[in-house]
Every structure is written in structure tokens, then in C-alpha cells.
């Protein structure tokens, strides 16, 4: 429970910082004392998460972006050898709103090889082309960051709370 809550809390903190990069417009809002001018985001934000470990992180983002759409994909590793040194990725389930012109935040706590992130992103693309993509994680490896830089659009922003020195022989952080 403590781990899940802390992952959610990190999600809230990164979401707050990321919110500063969105586009806003000023709108009049009616309050009990009159009309106030407030800045509201104009981006159509969609939170994309790779199932299971990503759920508490997703919730942290949803606590900040409470009007965001929700997208989910199931992607997991398939080991191609007995030593678990060759890794493939399998994608099964996909549920997402239309992503055309959306600001897609792909939130997943760990970015190890980048393979699941890439396959999840490609699955999301079957539902539209986002205007902007942010890849967000709690911890990443240099290999995973480089993989995202090679396989995602050039203007993708990568957000991570920590960068690990590298992957072990089993491709784990």
C-alpha cells in the first residue's frame, strides 16, 4: 500500500510540473461572489497507461488531470531464451478514446528497455495521431531513454524522476 501511494504521489508531482507545458486560455467562471477570469487548459489530454504496474501512477496523473481521457494497453515481456537475456514484447488489450490532436501522456513507472513503451505507443496510434506525446516514468535506464528518442516523434518529451545507471543482464533496472 505504501509503495502504491508513493507511486501515485510521484505521479501527482510530475503531472503538476508537466501541466506547466500545456496550452491555456482565459475563461470567465461564475463564482458565488461574481465572475472570475481563470486560465484553463485547451489541450485534450489523454492519459495512456501500460497495464498493471502503471495503474497507481496513472491515478496520480488523474488526480491532477481530472478531465483527461483514459487509454489502456496490456503489454508484457516475452523471454526468447532460457537465460532471459533476449526479450520480446507482446501486446494484447487496448482501450482508448480517439487520440487525433490529443496531448498523449504515456505514464508507466519504469522505462527499462523501452520496448513495452514503444509497442504501447504503436498500439495507441491505431486510435489516432496525437498532437503531442509525453513519456513519463518514475525511473528510467539510459537504454530506455535512448530507445524512446529513436522510436518516438522528435518532439516527444521524456519526464522521469530518476535515471538508473543501466540494465542488468536480464534487462531489468
Residue spans for each PLM region:
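PRPP-associated nucleotide enzymes
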Residues: 1-173
Amino acid at each position: 500500500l505504501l509503495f502504491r501511494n508513493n507511486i501515485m504521489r510521484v505521479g501527482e508531482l510530475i503531472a503538476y510540473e508537466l501541466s506547466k507545458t500545456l496550452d491555456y486560455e482565459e475563461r470567465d467562471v461564475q463564482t458565488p461572489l461574481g465572475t472570475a477570469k481563470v486560465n484553463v487548459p485547451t489541450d485534450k489530454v489523454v492519459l495512456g497507461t501500460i497495464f498493471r504496474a502503471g495503474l497507481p501512477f496513472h491515478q496520480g496523473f488523474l488526480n491532477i488531470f481530472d478531465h483527461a481521457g483514459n487509454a489502456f494497453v496490456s503489454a508484457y515481456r516475452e523471454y526468447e531464451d532460457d537465460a532471459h537475456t533476449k526479450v520480446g514484447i507482446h501486446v494484447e488489450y487496448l482501450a482508448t478514446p480517439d487520440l487525433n490532436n490529443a496531448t498523449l501522456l504515456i505514464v508507466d513507472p519504469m522505462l527499462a528497455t523501452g520496448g513495452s513503451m514503444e509497442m504501447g505507443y504503436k498500439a495507441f496510434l491505431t486510435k489516432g495521431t496525437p498532437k503531442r506525446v509525453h513519456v513519463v516514468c518514475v525511473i528510467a535506464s539510459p537504454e530506455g531513454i535512448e530507445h524512446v528518442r529513436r522510436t518516438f516523434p522528435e518532439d516527444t518529451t521524456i519526464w522521469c524522476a530518476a535515471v538508473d545507471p543501466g540494465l542488468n543482464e536480464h534487462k531489468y533496472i
